[in-house]
Amino acid sequence: MFSKTLVVLAAVAAVTVNGLTKEECDAAFTGEVGKLTKDALPLVQPCSSDSGFSMVPPKGLPTDDQYVKMCASKNCRDLLDVIKKAGLKDCELNFGSVFPGSVPLNVYQLGQGFDAKCASIGGGSTPTTAPPTSTTPTTAPPTGTTPTTAPPAGTTPGVTPSPTTPKPAC
């Protein structure tokens, strides 16, 4: 009896993704892809070129090397932002009917997990800018000496002589 219960639970788990059955996910395929067509489709090819990851047709999840490139790519970051905001269902979308040989891909999880994956592999999902550099170098005076201050540019230290007038020739 216990083993039959386990088999039934395994079967239910195999066809359910976060409360949705495989049939519900398959039925939602066209609508889910439709949510991405307008804004995401123009970014797919540039992201693929930047990263080497094939989202259309999907061959699986990106490798760590592809993730590093995706995290560094503005095209990929923009694409994943569109995916995150699309309101997709948490389903594996089976592209096999459209692209034979492709594998199911959970585009929702790819989008939602992108920032965390970038952080975990050190790719960061947002570009960082270097802090502004100072135009005036600062150095500490050597130990045991009294620091001196240079005069402002264009001035001379000490007493400034008064202007002289030329003396007449003899």
UniProtKB/Swiss-Prot annotation:
Q: Which Gene3D superfamilies match?
A: Elicitin domain
Q: Name one GO biological process term.
A: symbiont-mediated perturbation of host programmed cell death
Q: What is its main location?
A: secreted
Which cysteine-cysteine pairs are annotated as disulfide bonds in the entry?
C25-C91, C47-C76, C71-C118
Task: Provide the Gene Ontology terms for cellular component.
Answer: extracellular region
Q: Spans of biased composition, class Low complexity?
A: 126-162
Q: What keywords are assigned to this protein?
A: Disulfide bond, Hypersensitive response elicitation, Secreted, Signal
- Tell me where in or outside the cell this protein is found: Secreted
* Signal sequence, renumbered to the chain: 1-19
Return the annotated region ranges for Disordered.
Answer: 122-170
| SMART domains associated with the record | Elicitin
InterPro entries reported for this sequence: Elicitin (IPR002200), Elicitin_sf (IPR036470)
Q: Could you tell me what this protein does?
A: Induces local and distal defense responses (incompatible hypersensitive reaction) in plants from the solanaceae and cruciferae families. Elicits leaf necrosis and causes the accumulation of pathogenesis-related proteins. Might interact with the lipidic molecules of the plasma membrane.
Protein family according to the UniProt entry: Belongs to the elicitin family.
Q: Under which name does UniProt file this protein?
A: Elicitin-like protein 1
Q: Gene that codes for this?
A: POD-1
